[in-house]
Amino acid sequence: LTMQTAIGQGDTLVSPMYMAMLTSAVANGGNLMTPYLVEKIESYTGTTVKSYTPKIYKKLMTAQEASKLTELMTGVVEKGTGSALSGRGYTAAGKTGTAEHGDASSTTPHAWFVGFSNVEDPDIVVSVIAEESGSGSEVAVPIAQKIFDAYYNN
């Protein structure tokens, strides 16, 4: 059971939001940020009524640890299971996952991808889970690609 938990199998349960927060800590040099959904509120005339700024919740890892994870996650995109994201006009770092659940012999695994773009000065984090759909590289990465592409092409 312990080894299954260490590789994300068995009884390990996490939400896409939780995984996005952990990934943002890597992207932010080890700082776990307080999540927020609204950047600013504007009046009907376009005047900013209230704006919100990113806040550090706590230090989750050292800058060196975050840098090493970024390097490894960049490798996943450049030459690994996330390679569909390479050469798209932005840099990305990420990790795919294919999570077995239930009776693994009779169910289709959950497809995961977590990552961030503009590696040197990160812009956004994306967390995708497609339940009972297959592998992370075949299902979750193309979904993440559409999100990143929409962000940079709008």
Where do the model's predicted regions map?
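Active-site beta-strand/loop architecture of penicillin-binding DD-peptidases
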Residues: 1-56, 64, 73-154
